[in-house]
A protein has these predicted regions:
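Short, conserved phosphate/pyrophosphate- and ester-handling motifs at nucleotide-, phospho-/glycolipid
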Residues: 60, 142, 211
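Active-site beta-strand/loop microenvironment that shapes enzyme catalytic pockets
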Residues: 104, 108-173, 208
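Ferredoxin-reductase
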Residues: 15-109
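Reductase modules of NAD(P)H-dependent flavoproteins
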Residues: 163-253
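Short, flexible loop segments at the rims of nucleotide/cofactor-binding pockets, characterized by
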Residues: 95, 113-115, 182-188
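Active-site catalytic pocket residues across diverse enzymes, especially alpha/beta-hydrolases
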Residues: 51, 153-154, 222-226
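Short, structured patches in soluble enzyme cores that scaffold and shape functional sites
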Residues: 49, 67-69, 94-96, 120-122, ...
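Actinobacteria-biased recognition of intrinsically disordered, low-complexity terminal regions
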Residues: 1-24, 250-253
Length: 253
């Protein structure tokens, strides 16, 4: 006889919370059940909860975590890397930035049985199923979203992923499913030089995620190369010298 399925206790977010920007999301109570170092500066954190049983989301969406900061909390958004809604678990790949901020300090010291509150799912970026080719340009902060979206594509899809790394760590696990994509690791200057000479074919969909100025520059170069603006999805995860801009809410998407 199988064990009874856990019952979700997640609650809808009040319509007026954060000015109504969280409508359609849920309040979630999560427990940390797994921690693994998967690459330099990257921790894989696994959360579990009955609130995640049957939890539905679109690949690339995230949860807004209430991260402890002394006697207070602050909000940080982390992409759902993968999940098992039958078991009520979800994985998150979190960057460790040399311990400079409260969220980094929490992620670096996170331990089993830690409890956090979160809100989600969040985010409006989604794959374009009618595209004949998919181009991802992402930095370290956005790799979980790109990999999650890539794994949702059919195996016969044409996809290229340009990975912009700031600290030279090119051993991070990539997508485990989806198409046999082409992965190219670059620094910021290299990716902008490559994009300046790129002329995407008709039917290409581009997904530009990461630092705000990188996203803007990449978008301008792709448009100059002939790609229609409507074929480009953008999401700025952070701004240089401005941690937690907009309280964890992307400001350019």
């Amino acid at each position: 006889m199988s064990e009874p399925r856990p019952v979700s206790t997640r609650r809808p977010v009040p319509d007026d919370m954060l000015g109504g920007r969280l409508k359609g999301s849920y309040l979630l109570d999560l427990e940390l059940v797994g921690v693994d170092e998967i690459a330099p500066h990257v921790r894989l954190i696994t959360m579990a909860s009955s609130d995640l049983v049957g939890f539905e989301y679109t690949p690339g969406q995230d949860l807004l975590f209430e991260v402890p900061n002394g006697d207070l909390t602050l909000r940080r958004r982390y992409t759902i890397r993968r999940s098992d809604p039958a078991k009520g678990i979800a994985d998150f790949e979190i960057e460790i930035h040399d311990g400079r901020g409260p969220a980094t300090r929490w992620a670096a010291k996170a331990e089993l049985d830690d409890h956090l509150e979160a809100i989600g799912p969040r985010g409006g970026i989604s794959l374009r199923p009618t595209a004949t080719s998919h181009l991802f340009v992402v930095d370290d902060s956005a790799m979980p979203a790109a990999f999650a979206m890539l794994e949702a594509l059919p195996e016969d899809t044409n996809a290229t992923v340009l990975l912009v790394t700031s600290h030279g760590a090119r051993s991070r696990p990539a997508a485990a499913g989806g198409p046999a994509a082409s992965f190219v690791w670059l620094d910021r200057a290299e990716v902008l030089e490559l994009l300046s000479d790129l002329h995407p074919a008709a039917g290409t969909a581009a997904y530009l995620f990461g630092e705000r100025h990188l996203v803007r520059s990449a978008e301008e170069l792709l448009i100059a190369g002939g790609l229609d603006r409507d074929a480009i999805a953008t999401k700025a995860y952070w701004r240089r010298d401005q941690p937690n801009a907009s309280h964890g809410e992307p400001s350019y998407n």
